[in-house]
A protein has these predicted regions:
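Short S/T/G/P-rich N-terminal loop/turn motif that feeds into the first structured element of a domain
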Residues: 1-72, 77, 90-110
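Short, conserved catalytic or adaptor-binding loops enriched in Gly and charged residues
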Residues: 35, 82-86
Length: 110
């Protein structure tokens, strides 16, 4: 798996999806995630709970301009009905890298 460097912009998406919206949410993601690379984006991690009602993405972009271009892409708009119908509540948070903790210094670590 390729990892982002500190020069990249990193975002975390936390999606909370009602059980009856999971299929629509996943259809939207299947249509949209392949577009990331066209805009300097990279899906670093994609995590999901067992029933698909919570999904977390760690995504990075090479520039804010490309992130904005990705968000404005008409292909995303064309499938927006899927995410809307899913009733997913999405939170996108900009994040920054933190220096690694020295081994054994985290609370509770030994």
């Amino acid at each position: 798996m390729e990892h982002a460097t500190s020069a990249r912009l990193t975002f975390v998406l936390i999606a909370r999806v009602p059980p009856d919206g999971v299929a629509g949410f996943q259809a939207y993601e299947a249509a949209v995630l392949p577009l990331l690379g066209e805009f300097g984006g990279l899906l670093e991690r994609r995590l999901r709970n067992a029933d698909g009602t919570i999904e977390v993405h760690i995504v990075s972009f090479d520039s804010d301009r490309n992130f904005q271009r990705f968000r404005a892409d008409p292909r995303r708009a064309a499938v927006a009905h899927l995410i809307e119908a899913s009733a997913a509540r999405n939170e996108v948070v900009a994040m920054t890298d933190v220096a690694e903790w020295p081994r054994g210094t985290l609370p509770g670590a030994s």
